[in-house]
């Protein structure tokens, strides 16, 4: 079954230092699928929405390979915590904390995110 994008005027906004940045329309985020967005500094963020509607934003760069691919990873849960698995080497990153579930010494940046 394919989900149709929802129609809404809400935007996904990220907290960058002391300001909010509009990353995309909320309707662009399908539950369980990631979207990459370009940040003002040239970096990338991976945006996710889970099936309950919770939003997550992490750095898109896989720290193990250096490739900007986390937005294309597979999502799931581990012990009730949402994660994305890198599509390259399959390391899993907690979407709320950015910590790698397979090597806790490694993490990706996380961002405060909201729909407004």
Residue ranges and their predicted role:
Residues 92-102:
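Short metal-binding segments enriched for Cys and/or His
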Residues 62, 86-89:
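Short cysteine clusters
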């Amino acid at each position: 079954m394919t989900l149709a994008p929802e129609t809404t005027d809400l935007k996904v906004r990220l907290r960058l230092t002391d300001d909010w940045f509009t990353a995309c329309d909320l309707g662009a985020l399908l539950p369980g699928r990631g979207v990459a967005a370009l940040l003002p500094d040239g970096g990338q963020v991976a945006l996710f929405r889970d099936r309950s509607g919770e939003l997550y934003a992490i750095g898109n760069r896989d720290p193990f390979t250096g490739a900007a691919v986390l937005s294309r990873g597979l999502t799931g849960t581990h012990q009730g915590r949402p994660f994305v698995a890198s599509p390259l080497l399959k390391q899993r990153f907690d979407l709320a904390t950015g910590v790698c579930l397979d090597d806790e010494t490694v993490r990706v940046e996380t961002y405060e995110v909201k729909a407004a």
